[in-house]
Amino acid sequence: ATSENPKKLGILASSIKITDTKVEYIEYKDDGAYFVEETISGNIITSDFYKISNGEKIHSSQIISSVSGKNVISRETDANGQVTTYSVKGIVSRDTNEKSIAPYAIRTDNYSISLVGKKVTIASAAMAITLVSNYIPTTGAEDIIKKAIVVVAGAVGAGVACLPDYLYVTSVLSMHKSVGKIYYVYDNDYYLDSNKSQLIGHWTFRHR
């Protein structure tokens, strides 16, 4: 890690590390480099920001994010103890909702998600995506949130970049039969562009 600030502000993609319970990365802001550590516990995300100075990490602020309806509510406490509360949310623009001619396919949805918020982190963006994506549980969905983090982290790309303003989604719902039982499969593909040439993530869910 370096404390030197590049010309471009945002997240250093090569610094992103994802484990079962955490996501860590370096983010460049106007006043320098920060090490960000986000811990996931159920539907609660704790984001700690450390200013990198002369090779040392100095804790500067903490954001605790949780779910409230379709929004992510973030409560930030800075080094002086001042508290600020704001929301992060995903806004869906639905393009089409068309039926497939294939007998097993029920529906194909195409839509985009725009991320809106004062300070959007990788983990809070991931949580916002789970709240507005079709067929994804919004409570007790720790594993889903982790998968969303991978999608958003993949969207950052090489070098230093900000989180994407939009994600474009194709979601297919299909019905299958196995051993006399019917189950449904939900396939979601996430893209960076409206032409859907840059695939960055895929989720599959099965439900009886």
Residue ranges of each PLM-predicted region?
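Transmembrane alpha-helical hairpins and terminal membrane-anchor modules
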Residues: 151-167
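Extended, compositionally biased eukaryotic interaction scaffolds
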Residues: 1-3, 127, 152
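Hydrophobic alpha-helical transmembrane segments
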Residues: 142-154
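Extended non-catalytic interaction/regulatory regions in multidomain proteins
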Residues: 2-9, 133-145
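N-terminal propeptides/leader regions of secreted preproproteins
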Residues: 1-113
